[in-house]
Amino acid sequence: MKLAIVLLLLGLAVLCLGGKDSQHSASAGDSRSSEAFISRQDSANFARRHKRSYRYNVARGAAVTSPLESQREVCELNPDCDELADHIGFQEAYRRFYGPV
């Protein structure tokens, strides 16, 4: 009984989907499906990667974003400065260990 219902539903699906194909013409000019695609030039412009893409920065090395970032890295490499920075802040810890910022 279940097999008959499944076959009936599959047959109806084939009739519904098959009937739509016969209503449309086969020529490309009359087909509305060509509207779903864009030209190769437009797709190339759309898919073009930015010059500052992630892989480019990884291969080249990312630029330092903050002027204090290099000093922060120096302080992090010194365990005493790093510990003091956790308590009183990076700038004050760097000033105490290495002089004025």
From Swiss-Prot:
Signal sequence residues: 1-18
GO BP, sorted A to Z: biomineral tissue development; bone development; cellular response to insulin stimulus; glucose homeostasis; negative regulation of bone development; regulation of bone mineralization; regulation of cellular response to insulin stimulus; response to vitamin K
Disulfide bridges in this chain: C75-C81
Gene Ontology MF term list: calcium ion binding; hormone activity; structural constituent of bone
Domain of life the protein comes from: Eukaryota
Entry comment on modification after translation: Gamma-carboxyglutamate residues are formed by vitamin K dependent carboxylation by GGCX. These residues are essential for the binding of calcium.
Record-stated family: Belongs to the osteocalcin/matrix Gla protein family.
The protein's name: Osteocalcin
Organism ancestry: Eukaryota, Metazoa, Chordata, Craniata, Vertebrata
Gene coding for it: bglap
